[in-house]
Amino acid sequence: MFSENISLRNAYRQYGTEVLRELFLDWEDVPSDDSFVRSLHQVQKALWESLPINVSEDHPMLLPSTQGTFRSLYAAQAVQAKADIRRVDKVAFGVVGDAHWSYPHLQLCERWNALAEKMGFSAVFVPITITFSQTHLNLEAVAVSLERTESERLRFTDVLRLEASKCDTLLLPPLSLSQSWVHELEKALDKPVCEPLCSRETTAGVRLERAIASTFQKMGIPVFNTEQCKLRWSGGNIDKLEFLDSARQLRTATADQYVLTTGRFSSRGFNIIGKRWGASASGLPLFIERGKIWQTAFPPVEGYQKLGLALTADFRPKFSSEETANNLRATGSCIGGVDIGKRKLGLGLLALLGRECAKKMAKP
């Protein structure tokens, strides 16, 4: 067992180093091995503060997936790890859904129950149908409204309280709820709350975006949430930024320096062909390493590709004409998991490089 744990730790370290080497490939000053280790801890800390991770070093967790299966993983978000059916005995999971959501909770219950019985596990999945939304919504819209509106969170808690007695643990849709609110919800309902794995992490970027925004706000830099943005040029500089806010209202921002983040952009699924790229990042240079798929070093082995904004070594967006703006920088790169069967990209890892970007901005 001891040797297995050592091998697993080495696999995680190798994985983290590979991720960082990919992210640093285009840099002029490639860090030394010692810098890699320090940078890995910084990246992990930033990621884990916004997306807490549970790691199992002895046996893999067996977690329900929205594909109607169970996946064997050594690491998962903390809220997902609570649904490990290997570590529960005769637990009834209440699978929450709403008829207006794009989430087939009834069908998932049937598949998970059939599979659990076949595999000899005692976990039971009980459908809990609530009435929360009045119109048809995808889960991303539900998650954003819950993250941003306190009244919606209170109403959601009240609705769940009416049904909580039907189960031992509530299994919500993959909403990527913040850890602090998960704790509040568990305290209010007196029940554990968890989420299933999702083949495409639809809303993790909401929380990562908030972590990036918090970093900049502490530095005294205003942060705007945009649905779409358009850059206005003047003499090699960005003169102003026009953008649609969350209410779809056109706004204008002017500043001496601009920093763009990619949390919202890279949290969504994208067609590998690239047909859906322009929707939420119009006018920005996007890239994907089409010909390169590398693999993680620990189970389950998955393919990954790098996508995001095309940047120079000093974090300037690099447009097709090799033109860059003097007063524009961008943060963030995404190592995206690839679903070869469905030809989709999911959020594998978004590295928060705001600190390094800020250092570049501070240089004369």
Question: Where are the predicted features?
Answer:
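A conserved FAD-binding loop/helix module that cradles the flavin
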Residues: 1-3, 8, 268-273, 325-328, ...
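Conserved N-terminal/central alpha/beta ligand/cofactor-binding core
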Residues: 2-108, 112-113, 117-137, 158-161, ...
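Central beta-strand plus flanking loop segment that forms part of the substrate or channel wall
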Residues: 117-135, 199-200, 270, 277-306
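Conserved beta-strand-loop-beta-strand element in the redox core of flavoprotein oxidoreductases
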Residues: 213, 230-253, 258
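A conserved beta-strand/loop element that lines the FAD pocket in flavoprotein oxidoreductases
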Residues: 217-229
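FAD-binding beta-loop-beta segment adjacent to the flavin cofactor pocket
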Residues: 250, 284-342
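Short hydrophobic core segments
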Residues: 252-265, 328
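Flavin (primarily FAD) binding-site architecture
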Residues: 260-277
